[in-house]
Amino acid sequence: MPAPCNCIETNVCICDTGCSGEGCRCGDACKCSGADCKCSGCKVVCKCSGSCACEGGCTGPSTCKCAPGCSCK
C-alpha cells in the first residue's frame, strides 16, 4: 500500500488533510500551494525579483504573478 502522499504511485495528489508528510513523492503531477502542505518538497515556490511580493494564484513559475513592475524568477 503506497503512502497517501506518494502521488507518483497513487496518481492522486494529496497535500493537506490525509497526508501526514510521510512517504512524500510528488513529481511534476503533484504540486501544492496551500500553507497546510505537509510535504515540503511539493510546495510551489513563487520567487519575484528583489523585495517584490508574490500575488495570489501562483501555481508555479509559469503562473507566477509578481507585484507590478517586478519580474518572476
From Swiss-Prot:
Cd(2+) 5 binds at residues 48, 52, 54, 58. GO terms for molecular function: metal ion binding. Signal peptide: none annotated. This is Metallothionein 10-IV. Monomer. Cd(2+) 4 binds at residues 46, 58, 64, 72. The metallothioneins are involved in the cellular sequestration of toxic metal ions. Disulfide bonds: none annotated. It comes from Mytilus edulis (Blue mussel). Belongs to the metallothionein superfamily. Type 2 family. Cd(2+) 1 binds at residues 15, 19, 32, 37. The lineage of its organism: Eukaryota, Metazoa, Spiralia, Lophotrochozoa, Mollusca.
